[in-house]
Amino acid sequence: MSSYSSNNNPIETGQNAWLSINSFPYKATILEQNTNCDWLILGGGFAGLSAAYRLAHLRPKDKVVVIDALKIGEGSAGQNSGFMIDLPHNISASGNYTDSLEKDKKTIELHRHAMRFAKEIAEDCNVAKEDFLQIGKINGAATESSSVWNDQYQKQLLDLNEDHQIFDRKEMIELTGSEFYESGLYTPGTVLFHPSNYVRVIATKLRESFEIFDNTPAISMNFQNNSWLVQTPKASISAANIIFAINGHIQNFGFYKNRLIHLFTFAAVTQKFSSEQLSGRDQWGITPANPVGTTVRKIKDGDGFRLLVRNQFIIIH
């Protein structure tokens, strides 16, 4: 008999700013009665909900259940900066883009395939257009020395025959309303999205086809008699198959010991500003030309705007 258990459940100690920005009204459901299914998906983030959506098409007669230790949209899927980026930009310490063209092309196609799938889900589940914007992003250079990184990136894009546009200082001021940036490199393929709304709208739509439970962590799982018995705080689930979609939390069940490094990035969102206080275009996203720089995004919030700023990280071994 195979047996796995975890005494450590995901917790969130901070406030998710996205839940205060045009937040989708989502109702949580907790598993309180025993149930069974063909497929149990652990994790209600991007991977878990995408797997559920795909199973609904591939195995429409199978019963699918999704559980998440937190309320959908409150975990990492609902707390990132909301960039879906199609183009690789792998930078060596010397400032050179080092990946081979063939490898880059394969990476780009993989990214775009995933983004087409995400767009399909968004459209099928009625994610609001303002929560899924394909408006591209800018690699922003705040200093002349940082512009060198964009020069290297442009060489890579030319070799890949990818569309891009160089923004000078004046154009960056027109875009951002700030004199902070010296230049920028724009690429059109990036999607800027509202992370928590994206997963919550999808989860709400998918509930029409199968069961999704919030605040229902898996505590233990045992394989016996050709099925898995998964225990949660208030009930158990008998499942023929289990899909793990829980990112680094999988280590707490005993998998991948000493093989994963957990990387956390930290961001903050400002108070709401008026268009007079925060000029420039309504919405944009900037990633740093220098890989250790700051990611900034302007977000429309009702009749005002906010800035998201991300520039710190920690690594946990």
What is the predicted function of each stretch?
Residues 1-39, 57-58, 62-63:
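Extreme N-terminal leader/targeting segments of oxidoreductases
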Residues 43, 87, 232, 239, ...:
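Short, well-ordered coil/turn residues at beta-beta hairpins
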Residues 43-49, 69:
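Glycine-rich Rossmann-fold phosphate-binding loop(s) that bind the pyrophosphate
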Residues 56-79:
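Glycine-rich FAD pyrophosphate-binding loop
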Residues 75, 79-110:
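Glycine-rich active-site loop/strand segments that organize a redox cofactor
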Residues 82, 116, 124-132, 218-220, ...:
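Active-site substrate-recognition segment that forms the wall
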Residues 98-205:
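Rossmann-like flavin
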Residues 179-240:
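Helical element adjacent to the flavin cofactor pocket in flavoenzyme catalytic cores
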